[in-house]
Every structure is written in C-alpha cells, then in structure tokens.
Amino acid sequence: ICACLVGLGDVYKRQILNNMAKNRDSYVKNPEKDFTRKRKLSFQDTINTIVTYDAGSIGRCIKRYIPKVEKTPTTSAFLQQQKKLKLSAFQTLFYRFNDPFPDKTLYHLHILSVDGTGVTVPMDRINENKEYARVRTNKDCTRPAYQFHVSCIYDLINERYCDAYIEPFRTHSETHVFSMMLERKNFPQKALFIADRGYESYLLMAQIQHDGNYFLIRAREDFGQGSMIKGYPFPRDGTFDKTVTYIYTKTQNKRTKANPELYKRVATRNSPYFINKEHPYVKMTLRFVMIVLPNGQKECLITNLPANKFPPETLKKLYCIRWKIETSFRLIKYSANLLEFHSKKIEFLQQEIWAKMIFYNFTTTITQHLRYKRDRGKYQYKPNMTNALQMCKDYLRNAKTPNDVEGHILMEMTPIRDGRSFKRDKSRHQSVFTTFRHN
C-alpha cells in the first residue's frame, strides 16, 4: 500500500494538479490576473484545501493544511482565492483522477449503479434560492430545507464515483440526468447498469442497448396503473422469467390493433435512441424476471442480460450489490463531512460536493489496493472506511507518511458480514450552518 499511496499521491499532486496549474487559464475566471502573482495560496493549495475540508470552520481547515504561522493565510484571503476558481477545475480533476487506474470487473462486465441523493445545504431564505427549497410536510416547521439533488454513476466493484450531476431539488429529473450522463460516457464501457425503481424507462433501456451495454433495473412488482409490466402476458401469481420481443410504437392504427402479439403501444417522448419521427417503430427485446425475497416479498427485475448466462439467482445477487451506492452516500455525507458545508453560495457549495467525491475516490483507490488476510476467524476483513478517510485526509495535508497511513488503516479493520438487513429509518435532516463551527 505504501508504494500505491506514493504513486497515487504523485498522480494526484504532481501529474494532474501541477498540469492543471500550468494550464490554469481554462479553470479560472480571469486568466490574465488570477493566480499569476506569487501568494501564500497557490492554485494547487487552494484546491487541495477544499478537497481536505473537515467539519470545522474554514479557518481551522486552513490551519490544518498550512500549520506554519508565517505561511498561513487568513480566511478572507483564502475565500478571495477560491472565488477565482471555476467549477470546471474540480470537475476536470475528478475525471482525470479516474482515468489512469485499471478497473476490476465481474462476469467480464463493469458493474455500475446509478442513483440520486438529496444533499441538504445551508442557504438564505431568499427568492433566488426558491428552486432549491424542499417543501416540509410538518406544519410546525416554518423554515424550508434547501437541497441539491446529486445523481451519480458509481462503480460497485472498484467503489468509486464515475460521473455526477448536481441540480436543484425542485426541478430534478433522475431519468433525464441519467440519459445525459450516458451521452457523456465518463464511465468504462462494456458495463452493466443496476438501478432502483424510478429508472424503468424504455428510453433509457434503448439508449443503454444502443451503446452495447447492459441494464438490470428494478420495476414495480404489481400490475396496477403505471406499472411497466402491465399489459404484458405474464402470470399474476408466482415467479416467472420471460423474454419478450415487441415492436414498440406510439402509433395506434388497424395494424397495431390487429397484432397485439407483435406491437406494443407506449406513451413516451421522442428520443434519438428510441421512437422518433424517422423511426416510428422500434423493435426491442426485454427480459422480465419476477423473484421472491427471503421475507416473501416479490420484486420485478427488467434486464437485457442473456438467460443462459444469468439465471434469476445470479440477477438477485447482482442487484444486492447495488446497495453499495447507498453505503457510499452515507460515507461521503457523514464520514467525509459532506453535509458540513462552509459557504452559502451555490457556486462554492457545488465546488465542495465535487471536492468530496474526488477525496472519496482517492481513499477508496487506496483501500482497494490494501491486502489484508487472516488465516483464522469466521469473517473476511476490510478497512474501516471512516478511519481510512481520516488517514488519507491527513496524508493529503502532508501530516502523515505513507507508512503511518498504512499502519493506522491496518489497525482498524471491520468484518465483512454479508446478508444482513435492517429497517431503514427515515429522519429529517437539517443543514449545519457555519455559525456553529468550532475553531
């Protein structure tokens, strides 16, 4: 891990950040003036300080990154430097950091998941922030919660974020954003996309198949109004594994009515990958699988994976892996201190979200290369991610050596206990305002 940490730090600091600093005109708002003079905070230090933010105030974070008194800038000076940065600086660093590392696969496929999460942010109650306000159902609570909706593509095997899109909560559309991210192709090809309910869209399925990829999407298991399996000749009771081929169209005429076994009418918007004016009829093959969970509940999965290679039990195991993206949201929000923002400005808030994903990917890349094996015992073990995140943060601050980081990560390992399930409690989350931070 020491060699990996040194190499990873070299890629992050020297190769990527230094190259961006040399070509900083694309990442600053005023190329003729910004970061041209020699100051206490360079282009690299400004970005790295934001990447290593913790739950403390900005002043405390600066002092932890630059502990020497004569070199420590004031909070005001730091914010002036941060204001010079474009959001594209963090996005470019995020994408470039993912490029040089090899990817692990499962069944010769890159197993990816797509999902979104709400991120509560501190904002002033003004009209400009109205689209970020989330309406409260509690009548006693008068203050609205302000949220970003962050949609992500997450590599479940390599445990890192591949792409993300940030939008206001009120206007967010997960299917539209997923389609945009599919067009950007900032993820490894020959991929299997696993998604929860809400992504069962003919447009998305056609777009994924058009790119030569696969999907495994959970849909509503009932045959009620709005269910995708409504209208298909599937048994209402028990389980099934049916592969069907239809010609999908928005047209309703004598031919489509006379041949319901060949044509299926769907209500959908035009898409270059599905039904449009040039192609009013689109032939597509889908596989519908109804499975039963250990608690007796039924779940419907829609996929284009071949039945001879991926039986229902394999699909069930694959879908269970999807929970890793939910775990990553918990880790990045609470263990990596994403929810402890340091500004109310939309631009700075978005910078912090991208910075936390960069930091999360840095840490998981380190833990993926960690080799730890116990000959005795009931369980396999993995690094404690909360501890690993803190150790890697100290390393990026130059506060720990690679040997120290490795030793401290190995000191705190957690057992891998598969198959556990707990009730998912829902709670109301408040943003943490910067007024209540400790220096």
Give the location of each predicted region.
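Long, charge-rich C-terminal accessory regions
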Residues: 137-139
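Single, function-defining residue in the core of a domain
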Residues: 8-56, 64, 77-85, 92-93, ...
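DNA-recognition alpha helix
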Residues: 57-71
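Positively charged, low-complexity/disordered segments
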Residues: 1-9
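Active-site- or DNA-interface-adjacent structural scaffold in DNA-acting proteins
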Residues: 69-135
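Generic anion/oxyanion-binding catalytic loop in active/binding sites
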Residues: 1, 38, 67
